[in-house]
Amino acid sequence: MDCKIDIIPQVLHFKQPAGTSRGTYTTRKVWYLHFTAPEFPNWVGIGECAPLPNLSCDDLPDYEEVLAKICRQVENQGGKLDMEALCKYPSILFGLETAIRHFFEGSWALWDTPFSRGEAGIPINGLIWMGDFNRMLAQIEKKMEAGFRCIKLKIGAINFKEELALLQHIRSHYSSKEIELRVDANGAFSPTDAMEKLKRLSELDLHSIEQPIRAAQWEEM
């Protein structure tokens, strides 16, 4: 099938600075893919490629050039994806898969579920971005007032003792049955102190501790 993939870059602006252990985001660049085919002139499939700077494994300095090259290859292959070759570019694979599936479905309603019909929501965690103690506490209180019962905190940017105190503050007011706590260090801990920090965190009855050390540190894990 003849097909065409247009790449549309956009810069999204965060409503407030989003802090992680790798820095603070104020903007995020994304690339939207528009998949079309002359055979079906009224159809369009839209996908999104959105790697996170310094976090995604395919955050490349020449990302846009790589994306353009892959899109041309997919066009030449009639819209077929080489899944094995694209595994090392997960954000590109996601964008292409989404666009192609949307195109052939002919609708945003990819699945017939209460959520896709707008009849019910999906419970998710309330994400707390990194900041100083008071700012993070204010975010937590706001999420809880909004009805969230699962709170996920980004940790690793401020003093560990302050982050621990923040978690202890929550636990002193809410048990694990009332509030489920999750933390994400984004690889901020070093292999030398990770075990001690994990031990201290485990005392707070956390649901999970995501990526304590950096990716690909296989021996240390």
Language model segments and positions:
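N-terminal capping/lid subdomain adjacent to the active-site entrance of alpha/beta enzymes
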Residues: 1-181, 186-188, 195, 199-203
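Shared catalytic-loop signature of beta/alpha-barrel
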Residues: 69-70, 205, 216-221
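Active-site loop segments of alpha/beta catalytic cores
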Residues: 190-198, 212-221
